[in-house]
Amino acid sequence: MSYIPFPDISPELFSIELFGVTFALRWYALAYIAGLLIGWRLVLRMIRAERLWSFGPPMTEDQLERLLTWVILGVILGGRLGFVLFYQPAHYLAHPLDILKVWEGGMSFHGGFLGVMTALVAFCLKERISILPVADLLAAATPPGLFLGRIANFINAELWGRPTTLPWGVAFPGEAAQSCPGIEGICARHPSQIYEAGLEGILLFAVLSLLVWRRGWLHWPGSVSGMFLAGYGATRFLVEFVRQPDAQFVSAGNPLGLAWQISGYGLTMGQILSLPMILLGLYLILRSRRTA
């Protein structure tokens, strides 16, 4: 069976030791930082492009600077709490201090999304500015960060896919990745992180950029946010078919790791969380067109 060996890339860019304590900069942390900075620059560019707006941009550059702090808190707190509540509530209920161990991994996109939305609504109410136009700005600027995050997932050899015999399957390192019932020897898996990087990162960014800069969708508040939600939800729903489910959902009687099922058919947790995003996204698109 042909497969692609996992590249020899350290998850750490570099590490230094100060006063007996080792500090390391990981690719994952760099992806978060770079994603936020790129997103900020993209939003700033859209704010400055007056032709994109019917009645001017929804906020000033100074307000954008303040919003960035709120977004950072929403991403970190929401992403962590989402993982705790959606994927391993029993573990963290028994070991509450483990919630603080973010360096051990465990972030949820859906939780981060809810955290950012909560921060966005609170910020807009405080600043007395319209919510949907600001949400459109953030939606159009989010995919580059998603792309970088998925590449970091690949480098960390985490969130890999289900076993496959396809020639582009990757032999991820580690006992968990190589534990494939019924497969002898090297176990190759779908590089689902790369699939997601291409779909929710590159493809979604291309679509949203076209709608913003060529089709003028920022003139219809909520339309860009709706396309982001529907696009991300749909791509995540599809990738879940080849993505390895979280270990806590997998058992001898549930080898596919379905979080909800009837007669052997069902949905993974990622698919369950993505369906409301798709429905809300379609609603926002239709609403924006009816009120245009």
From Swiss-Prot:
Pathway info: Protein modification; lipoprotein biosynthesis (diacylglyceryl transfer)
Any one annotated GO CC term: plasma membrane
Domain of life: Bacteria
Protein residues bound to a 1,2-diacyl-sn-glycero-3-phospho-(1'-sn-glycerol): 150
InterPro entries recorded: Lgt (IPR001640)
Subcellular location: Cell inner membrane
Membrane-traversing stretches: 18-38, 67-87, 105-125, 193-213, 222-242, 266-286
One GO-annotated biological process of the protein: lipoprotein biosynthetic process
GO-annotated molecular function: phosphatidylglycerol-prolipoprotein diacylglyceryl transferase activity
Keyword field: Cell inner membrane, Cell membrane, Membrane, Transferase, Transmembrane, Transmembrane helix
EC number per UniProt: 2.5.1.145
Bilayer disposition of the protein: Multi-pass membrane protein
Xref: NCBIfam families: lgt
Family, similarity comment: Belongs to the Lgt family.
HAMAP family, per the entry: Lgt
Function: Catalyzes the transfer of the diacylglyceryl group from phosphatidylglycerol to the sulfhydryl group of the N-terminal cysteine of a prolipoprotein, the first step in the formation of mature lipoproteins.
Protein name according to UniProt: Phosphatidylglycerol--prolipoprotein diacylglyceryl transferase
Organism lineage string: Bacteria, Pseudomonadati, Pseudomonadota, Alphaproteobacteria, Rhodobacterales
Gene coding for it: lgt
